[in-house]
Amino acid sequence: MEEAKIPMLELGPITFNLTLLAVCIVTIAVIFAFVFWASRQMKLKPEGKQTALEYLISFVDGIGEEHLDHNLQKSYSLLLFTIFLFVAVANNLGLFTKLETVNGYNLWTSPTANLAFDLALSLFITLMVHIEGVRRRGLVAHLKRLATPWPMTPMNLLEEFTNFLSLAIRLFGNIFAGEVVTGLIVQLANYRVYWWPIAFLVNMAWTAFSVFISCIQAFVFTKLTATYLGKKVNESEE
């Protein structure tokens, strides 16, 4: 059996997974299209698509209000909204279709089902919260937080690393497992013709459950981002 080849693009020392890049672009395009469509012809009394958009904004604002000081919440509301939408769409992208090459490589998958992508996303969040902590509180005050109380400094540093790692692995594990089970259900339909109706019903139920779990994971990811950010920028954390 011929080994499945992953489409790659090499630019100097950096190698890009073209499939991952493509589904990321699709994710961004879906988000842009939704926000653009929902924000057209807005009315004083919201209805339909405008109501859906405003509900999402209010929902994410609520996450920020729980973990960020009042005077800082508005500064990060758009960031949290973008993170929530991106993770939610990315989580669900691979649930509804599958495009395989003749070698068996899947060209259509959720970006968040890729561990390298999740680690990169988690690294971005980790660096961002530390940069914001330095920008808001100053380098000395930021480092002081990591060394308070000073006997716990090694544990505080370990906590920063485990936060980064758990943020990525939690997301990857849930989304990857969902796509694996979906693939197994599809294979069940191909096993015998009389299994097709059962596989169809099971797949519909599993897809609905996976969409729910994917949205929960987007909520958890956004909430943890707001939590980590609040610990670095809030004055109350002094």
UniProtKB/Swiss-Prot annotation:
It holds the Pfam family ATP-synt_A. The chain crosses the membrane at residues 18-38, 76-96, 114-134, 166-186, 193-213. The keyword Transmembrane applies. GO terms for molecular function: proton-transporting ATP synthase activity, rotational mechanism. It is a multi-pass membrane protein. Gene3D superfamilies: ATP synthase, F0 complex, subunit A. GO terms for cellular component: plasma membrane; proton-transporting ATP synthase complex. Coiled coil: none annotated. Belongs to the ATPase A chain family. F-type ATPases have 2 components, CF(1) - the catalytic core - and CF(0) - the membrane proton channel. CF(1) has five subunits: alpha(3), beta(3), gamma(1), delta(1), epsilon(1). CF(0) has three main subunits: a(1), b(2) and c(9-12). The alpha and beta chains form an alternating ring which encloses part of the gamma chain. CF(1) is attached to CF(0) by a central stalk formed by the gamma and epsilon chains, while a peripheral stalk is formed by the delta and b chains. This is ATP synthase subunit a. It comes from Streptococcus pyogenes serotype M5 (strain Manfredo).
